[in-house]
Amino acid sequence: MRLIKAARVILFGAPGVGKGTQSERLLSRFPQLNTISTGDLLRHNVKNRTPLGIKVESTMKSGGLVADDLMLRLISNELFTRGWLKGQGPPSVMMLASEAITSEHSAYRQPPIDSFVASPFHHDEGMPPRVSDDPAASFILDGFPRTAPQAGNLDKIVPINLVVSIKTPLSVIIKRIAGRWVHEPSGRVYNTSFNAPRVPGRDDITGEPLIQRADDAEDVYRTRFRKFQETSEPVLEHYAKKGVLVEVEGMSSDEISPKLYAEFEKRFVQ
């Protein structure tokens, strides 16, 4: 199905609610839609030992959060690199993008990492970047924002025009995560109840072993769920005030997907 204008989307939901499954289905149904994963951008830099990757590696390994300024610059530079933002770009560009984009720009000289991180993110308020409304500039942003201040700063870079809060009962999610297996290097997620790997315990793409995450244990998950509720509420309120928040409820991914499709078609197809 073809989009007629750019969709700039964030999916919100508790861990295990099925955001990854819904993203994959949306990408399949709407070919112009792309995904921008801040986690993938960071992992790519760490894997390739870029100056940026070296800087954030210890923070990521310890489970800490990368500084907001750096995350905002990652997103901004990715959008400028893809051509989805026009105008005065960020003051410096590190290794930020997917392998294809990185390869294309591999001759670029990287600025010192300290100056990249130390200078706060900003853009010229008098000359805000122009956001492409080309349907090919459609994306789902994954992993950011996590707080209301982050959402406010993201607004200054690119206006998100749809935020979907996906809701499934806690008891259903707990049962679901009991069957969840993960390919840790790529982040691919499987479930023995649905979307099972072709070979039990092995990743479909690489054949490497799958693991069950320690934080999927029920007691740990309940703590994560409460924390998600506390932190997500102000973010959702922010987007509700912007008039772009939609809630979608369902007991399963198959129940949720048609509702998501309908929302996309109403906003970006018709």
Question: Over which residues does each language-model region extend?
Answer:
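Glycine-rich phosphate-binding loop of ATP-dependent small-molecule kinases
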Residues: M1-Q270
